[in-house]
Design a protein with these regions (language model features):
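Conserved segment of the helicase C-terminal RecA-like domain
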Residues: 1-35, 49-53
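Second RecA-like catalytic domain
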Residues: 27-324
Length: 324
């Protein structure tokens, strides 16, 4: 994948470093000339909401006038300020809100995930939201070897929820925890328990490293929310309550189905498609919330859960006005 001229020049410099060598580029020089000279700094191409939130927590009010090492676009700063106001982290006069904004700034997460954890405490499903945030913070939890495609699909079906991907992730995490609990009863040795979990992951086509990472993230975030005094509760099997909580947390990422089967992201107005990896891919619900927008040849939404569209105006009236 061609990135920029500077990186390609660095690669060329490796030829001949340890001994005689040559560098061959499998593209024309005119293509090289079209590339950017260097990588655009991350702060100029990423969501700045967490950066802005942390600066506000440090008492810095003038974000636009702040002396960044690399100045991000003004529009990106304004967009982040607007998002933080909608999430309740900032007041209308751009001050850090109390308690929500202060709580969000204490969590080492994307502000939307931080808000999700705070909201879930009110909805009495913090345990489930901890799982979802942890699982979304790591690489894909599923793996599908080409030579065992059908077996992997069959194994995944045992975890799938007809309500969407978030609850599917909860099901995987709960099943893994049950496996660990069983092995703990059989043997108190940690190494034996990890071997049992590794074997369970292999049998169910779950990425063991990703799952272990998710469990570590879960433990870390749980420590933060407990220090903040949030109510660590579970909704059990009441997934309607959990989906309502997801709506209240991720209302900025809602999409509604169009007559042609595509979706329209309500926050941006973009036409988007459901990613084939979603458990809802073949069902096409009327309204969903999602966590990720992937741009390839098309705009795809990933990590999706079906919701009732009426919940949007009920749970996020600051963003969705109802029509008389």
């Amino acid at each position: 994948m061609l990135l920029n001229q500077h990186q390609l020049e660095l690669a060329r410099g490796r030829a001949g470093r340890e001994g005689p060598g040559k560098c061959f580029r499998l593209f024309q020089e005119c293509e090289f000339d079209k590339l950017a000279e260097s990588t655009v700094p991350e702060i100029k191409r990423c969501n700045l909401s967490n950066v802005v939130l942390q600066l506000k927590a440090l008492g810095i009010d003038d974000i636009i006038g702040f002396d960044f090492i690399e100045k991000p676009p003004r529009t990106s700063i304004l967009k982040s300020l607007e998002q933080l106001i909608l999430l309740g982290a900032l007041t209308d006069d751009y001050k850090l809100s109390d308690p929500v904004g202060k709580q969000m700034s204490r969590l080492p997460l994307d502000p939307m995930y931080s808000k999700a954890l705070i909201v879930s405490s009110e909805f009495k499903c913090l345990e489930e939201m901890l799982i979802v945030v942890s699982m979304l913070s790591v690489e894909s939890i599923f793996f599908t070897p080409r030579e065992k495609l059908e077996e992997a699909r069959a194994a995944r079906k045992s975890f799938e929820s007809t309500e969407g991907d978030h609850i599917t992730l909860v099901n995987v995490y709960r099943a893994a925890s049950e496996c660990l609990e069983k092995s703990k009863n059989a043997s108190a040795k940690e190494k034996t328990m990890e071997k049992a979990l590794n074997r369970w992951c292999w049998e169910n086509f779950i990425n063991y490293r990703s799952l272990r990472h998710a469990r570590d993230v879960h433990s870390q975030i749980q420590g933060h929310v407990q220090q903040m005094g949030l109510n660590l509760s579970s909704c059990g099997d009441d997934m309607v309550q959990f989906r309502r909580c997801l709506t209240a947390a991720f209302f900025l990422n809602a999409a509604i189905r169009q007559p042609d089967g595509s979706f329209r992201a309500l926050g941006t107005g973009q036409s988007v498609q459901m990613h084939p990896s979603s458990v809802l891919f073949r069902t096409k619900p009327d309204c969903v919330i999602f966590n990720e927008l992937v741009r390839t040849t098309q705009n795809y939404i990933k990590n999706i859960t079906r919701i009732d569209p009426l919940w949007l105006a009920e749970l996020a009236p600051q963003y969705y006005a109802t029509e008389d």
